């Protein structure tokens, strides 16, 4: 699978909580039809070369899933997945530099980011790690950290022919202003971009 790059040339970056998923849906929804148009534009721009798949979405939560097939063997694919700094889009970090990202793949470890001036951010908390196979983390990505939600993200890697199939699911439930439906497409588009970048790296 080859994917389109996802630069920040769409007109924004994501180096603060307010822009991690582009402009927060609640802000845009308050602008009525104009805000809805902007929300749609952002989702289309972020989708890039990855196909969005919102499995379900309602007022209580949403579930998204993405799957790619890569030529790498499961152990190599999983190892590259853990090298998150190599493929995570810098436009979707707090610091703007993916070199600050790391995944400590053990229960109690985290997908974390070092911030300037000695700060740090926890993107997700690792609750299950099986080398070469499964990584499960919990938490709210980006501005979802500041909302009354819970989220569970699972990455699974399985043999497929001479390569591997990588599946990522992210399930979020809780309450946010404007309703969960407003967030589903943006989160799905962002995550679709990340797995596409991972697939590109594994295709090289």
Place the predicted regions along the sequence by residue.
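Short, cysteine-centered beta-strand-loop-beta hairpins and adjacent loop/turn segments enriched
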Residues: 118-120, 143-147, 174-178
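Hydrophobic ligand-binding cavity/cleft-lining segments
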Residues: 49-100
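Bacterial N-terminal signal peptides
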Residues: 35-46
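Hydrophobic/aromatic beta-strand elements that line small-molecule binding cavities or substrate pockets
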Residues: 66-68, 122-128, 151-159
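Bacterial N-terminal signal peptides that target proteins for export
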Residues: 5, 10-13, 17-37
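A conserved amphipathic terminal alpha-helix motif
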Residues: 165, 169-204
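Amphipathic hydrophobic-ligand
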Residues: 60, 147-154
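Glycine-rich portal/gate segments that line the openings of hydrophobic small-molecule binding cavities
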Residues: 86, 90, 96-142, 200-204
């Amino acid at each position: 699978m080859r994917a389109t790059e996802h630069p920040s040339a769409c007109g924004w970056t994501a180096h603060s909580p307010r822009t991690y998923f582009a402009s927060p849906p609640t802000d845009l929804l308050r602008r009525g039809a104009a805000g809805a148009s902007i929300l749609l534009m952002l989702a289309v721009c972020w989708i890039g070369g990855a196909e969005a798949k919102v499995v379900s979405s309602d007022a209580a939560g949403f579930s998204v899933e993405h799957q790619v097939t890569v030529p790498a063997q499961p152990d190599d694919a999983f190892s590259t997945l853990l090298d998150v700094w190599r493929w995570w889009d810098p436009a979707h970090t707090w610091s703007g530099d993916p070199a600050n990202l790391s995944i400590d793949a053990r229960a109690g470890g985290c997908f974390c980011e070092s911030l300037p001036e000695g700060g740090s951010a926890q993107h997700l908390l690792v609750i299950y790690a099986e080398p070469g196979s499964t990584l499960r983390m919990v938490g709210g990505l980006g501005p979802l950290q500041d909302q009354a939600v819970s989220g569970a993200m699972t990455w699974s890697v399985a043999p497929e022919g001479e390569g591997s199939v990588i599946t990522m699911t992210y399930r979020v439930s809780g309450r946010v202003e404007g309703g969960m439906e407003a967030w589903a497409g943006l989160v799905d588009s962002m995550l679709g971009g990340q797995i596409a970048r991972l697939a590109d790296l594994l295709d090289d």
